[in-house]
Amino acid sequence: MHAMTFAHRILGFAAGALLLAGCGGGNAIAPGQTSLLPPGIARGAHTNRAESWMAPEATGEDLLYVSDADGVVDVFSYPAGKLVGVLKGFASPAGLCSDPDGNVFVTDINNLNVLKYKHGGKKPIQTLVDFGHYPFGCAVDPGTKNLAVANYASTLSFGPGSVSVFVGGKGEPHSYEDQTFNAYFFCGYDSQGNLFVDGADYGSYHTQFAELAKNSSTLTNITLNQTIGYPGGVQWDGKYMAVQDAYTHTIYRFSFSGSSGTSMGAVHIKGDESGLLAQFWIDGKTVVLPYGTQARAVHSVGFWPYTKGGNHSQSFTVAHATELVGVTVSLAKK
């Protein structure tokens, strides 16, 4: 297995790409913008897991987990932002997700697996092997406890990615592919157990969006009525599916009917100048997002009002951060 390289992760596109909705179920990626997955993913840090630590009080607090592509996941009290732990031993941690029990899942791209941690735990309690794929985003269905993983690419000649679903959050995954996708980025379950995933087509000319309906074995392309310049995070917000446009710093809220998605509103995020892809996380009336105040650097975490958007209401800088990628909020059992 060859580790992902910087060149593989450049999702370039022609300057003449059209900003038109929905050819083949996707939207054109905006011209003039070269979006990159975080540079740290190529490094393959392999930090020592034995060096992980967690403050004793962490198990009783709500926690914010933040992945750094250089091989660690920082853990903060939420919403105070006090560092209470650091998880180590990853090659290249990326997308994060959590379940209603407070368990946290960390995709580790170059290790081809997803690690599960108890709320406030410093050692993984489960390793889910995603062999043959580079996992990037993840989501948990609260009803079935199925874990879905958006695989950026396959390890075989760096071929097209896929979606892996670990039924009940264990065992070997079921794999799903869509011929219009090349790279898969993020995914999210709605309240009915339907899975939605975004990504890009061959050459990264268009954003792609698809649904794996509950109990279905086929990904169905979804045509969105709103252009997505560059696909980012996907998460259910309690009413609509929130889909991030990393190019315009906007989170759109979609409802779906058949193979069509209709935007029901937009949340504009101000203050991010990094130009890099990072995952958001919605917690009630707050959306949390890693961001940067200068190009190609994501070293801070901000909280924005959801669904008002605008300027962040709170932020903090992560000490010694290399390139922040994903976030998730894990709630303590009360």
List PLM regions with ranges.
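Short loop/turn segments immediately following the C-termini of beta-strands
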Residues: D68-A69, I109, Y152-S154, A200-Y202, ...
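Blade-level signature of beta-propeller repeat domains, shared across WD40, Kelch, NHL, RCC1
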Residues: H299-K334
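C-terminal motif of bacterial Sec signal peptides marking the signal peptidase cleavage site
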Residues: L20-G22
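A short beta-strand motif characteristic of beta-propeller blades
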Residues: I41-G44, K82-K88, K123-V129, G171-D178, ...
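Bacterial signal peptide processing site
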Residues: G24-N27
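An edge-strand/N-cap motif at the start of beta-rich repeat modules
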Residues: G32-V86
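Beta-rich, blade/repeat-based domains predominating
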Residues: G40-E61, G89-D101, F131-N146, A150-S154, ...
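Short loop/turn segments that connect beta-strands within beta-propeller blades
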Residues: S77-G81, Y117-K122, V167-G171, L212-S217, ...
